[in-house]
């Protein structure tokens, strides 16, 4: 009660913001007559003047009224479109880093030009993010006319572009592209081995179009770049030879009595969970067998950190041999292991078991072993977009998800009023007992609209339902178009004409999104075709264009008289927002329209959440077959069900983010280290810091902190330094000579000797030459161990929920163990880099250059890169890297060395020319 009272007195937060923005709109409108007097060149010159004022310290907020007035005037001249006052309000909303909810057809694309222009004046770049490549190119070409007219440059960042083309796109003042491509470029930039290969600038300001689709619907699937790891065929074959020598235990021991074992063995196998566990005796037997096979050092344990992968491979081999059976779980076809779906019995061609199990089965069956896929880099959209200095978004439907935008991204949602009040009539839902009755009613409604000349958009939740309705319409001989969000350019054209009289268009939720449905059809497209045709004389062009416009005006009035665009929805989506998006396609710019949802008790949402209640009402009213129930209580029940699903989905996304935040913090540290290494001209201090840490760790293994001489193992320390680090340090002699030597003195002595030895090595070839080798060693080590760390985090994540059974908080356990894994990663990099640099024997400049290039080539040797990303229809796509495909086609050609002249004859080095594609 009190919040409502306060709102009625002071107005809501949304109303107060709109009031504040309207005051600025008055200032912009007052400037319009002044800017109308300027010539085109004078208007364009304003851009340079604004840039200078920003450089001199003026803020963008101070420039806003003038800049918005310039964009509005430029748009009138370049696009023949004038920004409405509500679009100016929307522009301010986006500039202030908020989400603007603007109804479909109110001109979001044009609205975005205002904050884009203003923020581009700072010279740091602005990214406009769209849901698909077609929209990115369309908007860049369409709005690019305005930006170019005002003196700004525009770039399009698309897939399959060369590095140089991407760098040019990012260097532009305004860059259009898809969410997937921006994210993948960020990941690729953090995999390069040279600064010149990076494409992105700093992440300054992004405006996300259809922000709900990108930041909510697609946020459950991370972006992943993966590639084939190093070939471990030999290891799989050798472990496959060990697995048959281990005996399966029959029966399981009771933890209290120890009874229950029928026949003792080396491991137990659980057919239900498909897991194996070694017994105590089995561990000892396995260690002995692995040592005999030369896979395990004599006396080492399978539990040692260094042998974790060995244990993993042994378990995979035992599972493959005892729990996965040919012609039950898989078949062998054409020399490949193909998985059989245990529920349907169908072959799942192309699918592979993870964790090395598939390779273990291949080794068991004696077919060629295919390399394991390894995650090279990954990031969620939540964590990528939160890196921008300023983030804004626009959509037709955000208010239902306002809480999530605020909670996850810190983005406030502002509902922007329409330019003209809506005239769309949203009718109550009709609920039928069966799907068959529902579809009959849908077809009847479509037939009625078709006969009256009213255009219909039929919304479905799946491609399967689209095709079902299409078949029903064919049966009744009703002409129609079907869109499934697959061919964006063609679908945009069909959607643009979906407002013509008698048009029937069936579309899944996402199909044709971003394109307005204009009543009477889209005359602009047809005008563009005539203008682009050079064969038509100029006078004839004008006559034809006028004829088209007159014809359209007649059709427009005809459709308005028939009731505007009718939305017929065949099912409720689990999200109210997506239902609202469908409704919002009708009634644009104050046009008439209508919408209705046809439901059945067999729909998943009804069945799970509201079915029993509605069924009881139907039975009480004794509804005959084919009759529908139409009541507010039903619609409210369904909305309540949708709220429950939305809350559950929000919890899933929030939980995903909480886990990903752990790896994100670690990702930032690793990527920052990589960037420091790439940009640093001299790595001596960094290497010295690592060397000091490594030497301290080695000494502390034999000489504990604050210990006395009797506790020191001097012979052991001298042996390790000599054998593993090639350091001859006379520690024993020094200890005998001195009366008061401490453990700290020993650390100093070893560190000093290591520094002197290393300095001598660097002096042989020169500091500048050796620095390139140091950089290659550091990057190679960080990248290799980071990939292994990502796999380790993945393993940890998959089983962490089981900690709940032990009364432990899985999230806290994940954070703690992930931190321990990360500390181990940093220690491993420190020891690996120092050991390699201390023990490598380099005597000439040529040797150091060759060694650095060999490491770079190894870093680039990861093959068959694939990109995993969410799709608009809610699925997940896995695409091959175009550069990898080119490299595979070139594989038969003898490869040139990195520094050899490129075979194409350009005169450049191979690595700077076609070597980049490989």
From Swiss-Prot:
May bind 1 zinc ion per subunit. One of its GO terms (molecular function) is protein-exporting ATPase activity. It comes from the Bacteria. Gene3D superfamilies: Helical scaffold and wing domains of SecA, P-loop containing nucleotide triphosphate hydrolases, SecA, preprotein cross-linking domain. It is a peripheral membrane protein. Keywords: ATP-binding, Cell inner membrane, Cell membrane, Cytoplasm, Membrane, Metal-binding, Nucleotide-binding, Protein transport, Translocase, Translocation, Transport, Zinc. Its cofactor is Zn(2+). CDD domains: DEXDc_SecA, SF2_C_secA. SMART domains: SecA_DEAD, SecA_PP_bind. Transmembrane segments: none annotated. Its EC number is 7.4.2.8. It catalyses: ATP + H2O + cellular proteinSide 1 = ADP + phosphate + cellular proteinSide 2. One of its GO terms (biological process) is protein targeting. It is found in: Cell inner membrane; Cytoplasm. ATP binds at residues 87, 105-109, 516. It is an enzyme of class 7 (translocase). Monomer and homodimer. Part of the essential Sec protein translocation apparatus which comprises SecA, SecYEG and auxiliary proteins SecDF-YajC and YidC. Belongs to the SecA family. NCBIfam families: PRK12904.1, secA. This is Protein translocase subunit SecA. The lineage of its organism: Bacteria, Pseudomonadati, Pseudomonadota, Betaproteobacteria, Burkholderiales. The gene is secA.
